[in-house]
UniProtKB/Swiss-Prot annotation:
Keyword Hydrolase: no
UniProt source species: Staphylococcus epidermidis (strain ATCC 35984 / DSM 28319 / BCRC 17069 / CCUG 31568 / BM 3577 / RP62A)
UniProt entry keywords in alphabetical sequence: Ribonucleoprotein, Ribosomal protein, RNA-binding, rRNA-binding
Domain S4 RNA-binding residues, every copy: 92-155
GO biological process, one term: translation
Protein name: Small ribosomal subunit protein uS4
Taxonomic superkingdom: Bacteria
GO CC term (a single one): small ribosomal subunit
Gene3D superfamilies according to UniProt: Ribosomal Protein S4 Delta 41, Chain A, domain 1 (1.10.1050.10), RNA-binding S4 domain (3.10.290.10)
Name of the gene encoding the protein in the UniProt record: rpsD
SUPFAM superfamilies noted in UniProt: Alpha-L RNA-binding motif (SSF55174)
Protein's job: One of the primary rRNA binding proteins, it binds directly to 16S rRNA where it nucleates assembly of the body of the 30S subunit. With S5 and S12 plays an important role in translational accuracy.
Length: 200
């Protein structure tokens, strides 16, 4: 299944979650497109709820179905709770960490920064958004990319970096200190529904 490339605003409203991370999509019309008000949502079946939760998380990270399922399967082979492991693996992706550090205003921008070679890990350029970070690894912006407006503006307005990361805004240098805890990740996602979806 190909990565979704349609309107993120419509998709955000349909799923009831801000895919951009800004929340602007839901400010004026916090209901699905094509509906006439917030009370028009159809009651979903158990399968429908599971599917919607899976789509919410997949679109949030901008992944193809194959990438998403592969990561889910890897999480299932790890010790611990499958759903929590899955969420932690997703949050440990390079593009997710670039976004969480505040180097990009949206996850899509973060993915583009990585794709276009603007990001380095431990001093070497990495252009794979799905690159899985390990504790202690250092994320920096390439020297020739440090004056990009998209990066400077993002860092300027960002006022929060999660505790599992460390960020030196002056040098555009971040450290993946440790794996995040579930409580530090999106609370609006019920990953157990995703586990149930793939366990059908």
């Amino acid at each position: 299944m190909a990565r979704f490339r349609g309107s993120n605003w419509k998709k955000s409203r349909r799923l009831g979650i801000s895919l951009s991370g800004t929340g602007k999509e839901l400010e004026k019309r916090p209901y699905a497109p094509g509906q006439h008000g917030p009370n028009q949502r159809k009651k979903l079946s158990e399968y429908g709820l599971q599917l919607r939760e899976k789509q919410k998380l997949r679109y949030l990270y901008g992944m193809t179905e194959r990438q998403f399922r592969n990561t889910f399967d890897i999480a299932g082979k790890q010790y611990g709770v499958h759903g929590e492991n899955f969420m932690i693996l997703l949050a440990s992706r390079l593009d997710a960490v670039v976004y969480s550090l505040g180097l990009a205003r949206t996850r899509r921008q973060a993915r583009q920064l990585v794709n276009h070679g603007h990001i380095e890990v431990d001093g070497g350029r990495v252009d794979i958004p799905s690159y899985s970070l390990k504790p202690g690894q250092v994320i920096t912006v390439r020297e020739k990319s440090q004056n990009l407006d998209i990066i400077k503006e993002s860092v300027e307005i960002n006022n929060f970096v999660p505790e599992y990361l460390d960020f030196d805004a002056d040098n555009l240098k971040g450290t993946f200190v440790r794996f995040p805890e579930r409580s530090e990740l999106p609370a609006e996602i019920n990953e157990q529904l995703i586990v149930e979806y793939y366990s059908r």
